[in-house]
């Protein structure tokens, strides 16, 4: 930990830190950190993930700016190890490239080729990062992952500022870090798999199964799919088994899971509370009921995209549009309940015009929601 002291001091005083992580997440729910890579003040550091990095995490949370490329898994890992969330100082070069028209999910390798005209190999992606010592190839690969990252960021920031997009990108990066930090209450986990086609009874079965699976995954530190895959849960809801024999023969469930937890799975599916305790059936998503308004919505998005020179798929996502439509239909009026992305810089130029379009359509449409 004494060797980390000068690195921590640099992180605290630097204007920008380039970061990446190498980890293993094959048979566990939580990632196992192998290496934390940091490029600060012209120096690249490869830090052993098995060390106590509490002070490093704190320094990164307090830093002026942390640069990542495709930060999702990295910051999720940081949240887990640091025990705090969310980060509020992230600049993601992948997000920046999307704003500048390179595409939404440009790889680091492709980003370096397109922006810096540098070619790097990605031959250690599936390497064992928990092995000690690391091979020379692993060390070189890990170092390269952050060596060019600050230069890439600076080139992109220059372009973003010329287009007046820089603040937009910082805002979207912040919203993304908040999204990754969100943790659903365990009793609401089932909503990630629920849809409007499920009956209230099926939603109750799903809720009980999802809570049980989540608790067991945490207890065993195993991926949820190792216990029950999502498509198997769907099959269990569609054709509810009554016996252990049916559970063994009709579904692709691991024998060990059936052996140790089969009876409990059957109970969760068949022993339900009173119907009054069932979850309310989900309404059909409003976006499916607005087919005749779809052209107007797409035209407005295309218009704003052209005016701002920002790709349409960056301006609006299906998830946000669905949430916006629901918000308008429920006549909520509370802007704070809108998706974060729909507020901020998008609000005046896109969200408000779309609200008017959707509201006009809903005024002439009668919805019925069945339970």
Where would I find each of the regions flagged by the language model?
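Conserved RNase H-like, two-metal-ion catalytic cores of nucleic-acid enzymes
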Residues: 1-110, 114
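Conserved phosphate-coordination/catalytic loops
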Residues: 2, 72, 143, 227, ...
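Accessory DNA-binding and partner-docking regions appended to nucleic-acid-acting proteins
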Residues: 136, 156-371
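Internal, well-ordered alpha/beta segment that forms a basic, Gly-enriched binding/recognition surface
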Residues: 65, 69-165, 173-181
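Short, solvent-exposed polar/charged micro-motifs at secondary-structure junctions
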Residues: 26-31, 99-100, 132-135, 236, ...
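Short, well-ordered coil loops that connect the C-terminus of an alpha-helix to the N-terminus
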Residues: 13, 42, 84-85, 118, ...
